[in-house]
Amino acid sequence: QIKCNECKYGEIYPKELETVMDKVSLYDWFERLARVIKYLSLKDYVALSDVESYNTWIEFRKTNEEVMVSIVKAEKEEGSHDIEFNLKEPIAGEWEKQVIRYSQLKTEIIEKLGEYVEFITISNTEHPEIEKIDELLKGFQKCDF
């Protein structure tokens, strides 16, 4: 679940649905959000696909040090990727134009990623994604973007 100011997007699935629902792992979400942060250091517009939905995107528009976050609907064209830099005719979704400072967005993602690494390490030292996500966190913390 993503929360920006008081607006929320996404679902937190109950544990009993884990075996029957095909869903994107938290690692994948964190990896994609890390790429959004990196791209926002270079570009003013980044759209992150909600790969679990038909046509929903999380849109990030950066102006100076502020990022405006919106949920938008736009067709996922053939050959599109999980992150795009231009959407064709996006339409406002559940909420829009929530403003957050770029530094705060970056800090929040790093903190939540750290909490996730700590949680899965404590809960299950055999978790297959622990090493990958720990490397992602360390790399993210080293980068100055």
Positions of PLM-derived features:
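N-terminal "first-domain core" detector
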Residues: Q1-V24
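Secondary-structure transition/turn motif
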Residues: I2-C7, S70-E78
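Generic structural signal for well-ordered, non-transmembrane alpha-helical segments
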Residues: E31, E65-M68, S103, T107
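Short, structured protein-protein interaction patches enriched in aromatics and acidic/basic residues
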Residues: V46-M68
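Mixed-charge, glycine-accented linear interaction segment located at domain edges/termini
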Residues: E78-F145
